[in-house]
Amino acid sequence: MLKQRTIKSIVKTVGIGVHSGRKIELTLRPAAPGTGIVFSRVDLPTPVDIPASAMSIGDTRLASVLQKDGVRVSTVEHLMSACAGLGIDNLYVDVTAEEIPIMDGSAATFVFLIQSAGIEEQNAPKRFIKVTKPVEIRDGDKFARLDPYFGFKLKFSIDFRHPAVDKTGQELEVDFATTSYVREIARARTFGFAHEAEMLREIGLARGGSMDNAIVLDEYRILNNDGLRYDDEFVKHKMLDAIGDLYVIGHPLLASYTAYKSGHGLNNALLRELLAHEDAYEIVTFDDPQAAPKGFAFDAQTAFA
């Protein structure tokens, strides 16, 4: 059977919170089959566990934020994206603040941590959410959509109308049957505009944001000396975000995702719309790994990645 996965050993790192600017400790721990991805605020007098789920996402203005009883864990999308890319079903994520450290602004550090810990198959069938009917959410000209597809593919279009972004790819289509998440998506960094960063700092946000963890643009150009990691890094990062946003549903999706100018809020609304229609999806497992879509019947160390 195609099995669930966790990590083999505990792994730790320290990074900066993009909004608080503070040093944050992050610990990843193995979890039993059926646990899911569970975030734990271990800095509180009594630690609070917040399982990743579509219904636990609250604030989505600047990141995907998990909330439970007034306790928050922000900026979960890059770590969730790495878990999706490496096929991690079960994981405890201990964090000492209300945000996951930003690291280099991509998912690459989290991929490295998980691969360093080692990936272990578990004696339980991996559960997929198979989309059986189209589901769509629109907001003005923005939209996000899921269609039935035996596999996982994404098509994302952006439109920032900025000279530096316009010169790069504005549209990307990826099918993980034939594309490596680790090589092609994981290293794409978040990006932002210098004038927006100043405004955010004035209201106490983005205190940890810098060219060490983001692509920074002024009105005309990229300010980072080292340029881009991919020719189409902007749209690739939006896809990286979408993969993480979608993975909070708790299982990998078997679906085709299409989006135009979507963000964390629209992605979460799409998941809620899917879950609201029980006839639009079903839970499936694969007794024979070879019967799973290409890209999911991976060996123990890689991903649809």
Curated annotation (Swiss-Prot):
Pathway: Glycolipid biosynthesis; lipid IV(A) biosynthesis; lipid IV(A) from (3R)-3-hydroxytetradecanoyl-[acyl-carrier-protein] and UDP-N-acetyl-alpha-D-glucosamine: step 2/6. GO terms for molecular function: metal ion binding; UDP-3-O-acyl-N-acetylglucosamine deacetylase activity. Keywords: Hydrolase, Lipid A biosynthesis, Lipid biosynthesis, Lipid metabolism, Metal-binding, Zinc. The keyword RNA-binding does not apply. Zn(2+) binds at H78, H237, D241. Its cofactor is Zn(2+). The active site is at H264 (proton donor). Belongs to the LpxC family. PANTHER family: UDP-3-O-ACYL-N-ACETYLGLUCOSAMINE DEACETYLASE 1, MITOCHONDRIAL-RELATED. HAMAP family: LpxC (MF_00388). This is UDP-3-O-acyl-N-acetylglucosamine deacetylase. The gene is lpxC.
